Every structure is written in structure tokens, then in C-alpha cells.
Regions:
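Residue-level signal for inorganic ion chemistry
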Residues: 32, 63, 74, 115, ...
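Short helix-loop capping/hinge motifs at secondary-structure junctions, enriched
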Residues: 159-161, 166-169, 284-290
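An extended, acidic
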Residues: 173-306
Length: 306
């Protein structure tokens, strides 16, 4: 059964939008999988997987190809839609420091979340698309090409599901684990520091699973394999495009994704950094997790804004 109608800009029909998103996402999957196999990607993109080691991390030809595919696809399908398109790859040209975009409706895209994992061949990468309305993500899409999983989360009806290329759907299945010592943590392969290790020691969670990509991490929570993901900013911080789509899907699945003080995540605020101690969970023990994390961070890093 498909979810009931969601809130979209005037003139945007849910059924057609979801169909277009499916087409664009599976096209993006074809591009990434071809690059991953060293083959000629479809749609005329260059075969060479060139990599620019930028200051914010590597940017590959695959990032740029999927970015163009998604932006062009949305623009062509909806030339008169009342929304603005923003992606990780266009942010430098579009954004002015300290100023939000003048957009009631805003698409925030990450064409390749987990570029390092993609280049390393782990398969743990994702594509993120989020539709944001007045700072809140109201539609989230997370694509995991190698797993052939396409996740959707729609506000306000609180429905989240995944589907494969054949359109077969399954609802999210969050775990029922409750005691903190039983919760399974999903953590990054590449972003760990001493403060995070101290925080995890204070929380005394259960097992840990290492996965690349924020979307990939949240997908393990959606499948019930893990329960908690923690993002702790330091010299750098995740950005709007890292968090918006996974947060929307997890929230609509019945989970939670907030700051440790319980504040919700907001987007297009004039600062794309999602700084602080951010906690994503299956929701069952979220308040306890947040309270314990906030108290621990007060000892570990006094003055740190969670």
C-alpha cells in the first residue's frame, strides 16, 4: 500500500514525484555501479574515474556525474516547480556565509555520500535527496546502489519503506532493544576522535558495527541491525546534505534524530554545518541516550554546545 498524500508545493502530485524520484535514483545507481566496475557509465558521462582531493574530502567524476544527473533530471521534470535545488557540489557557488537561501521549498542533495568508501570499493555509500520545507525535511530518499535498496520517508503521515528495482516494498523494521547495554552502535570507519571514544565509554552501549556513509548507517537502524548512531563535531562537522535525507526517513520510520539536548535538526539556517552532538536512534531509548550523552559531554568537553 502506498502512503497517503504528503505536503508538497502547489501543483506537485505525490504519485508522479515518487515515480520521477525512482527513475532518477535508479539512474544514479546505474552511473555509480558502472564507475565502480570500471565500465563506461550510461547517459554519456566520461569513463575515467578522476578524483580531486579537495579540502572537504575527495570529489570524484562519479560525484559530479550523479550530481548533474539529479539536478538536470529534477529541473527538466519540474521546470516550474516552486522549489530551489541545492547540492553538495553546487553549495560553494550558491551559498553566502551566514545567509540562508531564499527558498520556502528546498531540495538538498548529496550525490555520493561516502566518496571514500566508494573509491575504496567497500560498497558502503549512498545517494541522498531531501525536500526541505521552512527548515524541516519533509521527504527523505536514501539510495544504496549495491544493496539495491531505495528508502523513502514521507511527512506528515509517518511512513517509511524501502523498495527494490522491481518496486517490491518493505516497511522499516526498527529493533525493540531497550537497555543501553544491549543497543548496537553503528559507527564510522573514518571519523573517530578521543572525545567520541570517551563518550562511547560513558554510554556503555553494546556491540559496534562499522559502516561508511551516514545514509548507510541510518539504513542499518531502519533494518533493525543497529540502534544508535552518534555524530560528534570537532574540527569539521557534517553538513545539511549528509543529514537531511537520512533524518527524514528515520523520523518517519518511528526513530529519532536530534541533538543531545533534544533539539530537532534544522536546515537552510545560513550555516550548513550540523555541529554538536547529534544522536540518531531507533527511538525506544532516545531520551535516555540524549540525557546521558549531554551529561557526559559536559564533563568531557565543558562548554561544547550539544
Amino acid at each position: 500500500m502506498m502512503p497517503a498524500a504528503a505536503c508538497f508545493p502547489p501543483g506537485i502530485a505525490e504519485e508522479q514525484l515518487l515515480a520521477d524520484l525512482r527513475r532518477l535514483c535508479w539512474g544514479a545507481a546505474d552511473i555509480l555501479l558502472a564507475y565502480g566496475r570500471g565500465e563506461q557509465p550510461p547517459y554519456g558521462f566520461p569513463k575515467a574515474l578522476s578524483v580531486d582531493e579537495g579540502g572537504e574530502g575527495p570529489v570524484s567524476a562519479a560525484d559530479l556525474a550523479v550530481n548533474q544527473w539529479l539536478l538536470d533530471g529534477l529541473a527538466q521534470a519540474y521546470p516550474d516547480a516552486g522549489w530551489t535545488l541545492l547540492s553538495e557540489e553546487t553549495a560553494k557557488e550558491q551559498l553566502t556565509a551566514g545567509e540562508p537561501l531564499d527558498a520556502e521549498w528546498l531540495w538538498i542533495l548529496d550525490p555520493l555520500d561516502g566518496t571514500k568508501d566508494f573509491l575504496q570499493g567497500t560498497g558502503e555509500y549512498a545517494v541522498h535527496l531531501a525536500l526541505v520545507h521552512r527548515g524541516e525535511a519533509v521527504l527523505g530518499v536514501v539510495l544504496q546502489p549495491l544493496l539495491e535498496d531505495l528508502w523513502f520517508g514521507l511527512v506528515p503521515e509517518g511512513r517509511a519503506w524501502r523498495e527494490n528495482r522491481a518496486g517490491e516494498q518493505q516497511p522499516a523494521q526498527l529493533s525493540s532493544r531497550q537497555a543501553l547495554g544491549e543497543l548496537v552502535l553503528v559507527a564510522s570507519r573514518n571519523h573517530r576522535d578521543q572525545r567520541l571514544e570517551q563518550l562511547l565509554e560513558a554510554l556503555a552501549l553494546g556491540d559496534t558495527k562499522a559502516i561508511g556513509s551516514v545514509g548507510g548507517k541510518v539504513a542499518t537502524i531502519l533494518r533493525g541491525e543497529t540502534d544508535v548512531y552518534i555524530s560528534l563535531s570537532g574540527k569539521s562537522a557534517p553538513k545539511d546534505w549528509d543529514m537531511a535525507a537520512p533524518e527524514a526517513v528515520l523520523k518517519e520510520a518511528g526513530g529519532a534524530f536530534t541533538h543531545a539536548d533534544g533539539a530537532p535538526l534544522r536546515y537552510n539556517t545560513g550555516d550548513v554545518r550540523q555541529a554538536g552532538c547529534l544522536i540518531a536512534s531507533h527511538g525506544v531509548s532516545h531520551q535516555e541516550l540524549c540525557a546521558k550523552a549531554a551529561e557526559a559531554m559536559g564533563r568531557i568537553d565543558p562548554g561544547f554546545a550539544v
